[in-house]
Amino acid sequence: MPAIRPFRALRFVPEAVGDLATVVAPPYDVLSADDRARLRASNPANVVRLDAPTEEPGDADDDRYRRAARTLAAWRSDGTLHKDPRNSIYVHEQTYRVPGTDVERTQRGFFGRLRLEPLERGSGVLPHERTLAAPKEDRYRLLRATGVNTSPVIGLYDDPSGRAGTIL
């Protein structure tokens, strides 16, 4: 069974950013260039500036990652982001409309810290898809520059007894 632990999250400060809906974004790998531009325009503190930094004309190899790191430092300094004082498990709920329908769904889960172990150790965490070299390199370079995970790894869990659902 995977060991899930609490952690101290960096969170947007609502008083600094306004409506939290304007600072969130879909996963970086589903965003088009137009999506990124729209999100950047929606709020100067939209997370896309950290999670999917764009290349600017004249950029050297790692400039966009360094720019994300500078943005992160500025947001921490000016109060846009705040690091929680205590380790926590963060409950998450997101309601959305299924594209092209009037159907509304709610996704519930949590954010926690999980140690990644090699598969052969039997950690209980199974691979979910084939991963490609370029996106892995991109995420590694962003992590190396910023020192933070800017987007979660999404996992599914089996809960036949409903225990996790009751807790959430």
Tell me the role of every PLM-derived stretch.
Residues 1-168:
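A cross-family signal for N-terminal binding/gating loops and helix N-caps
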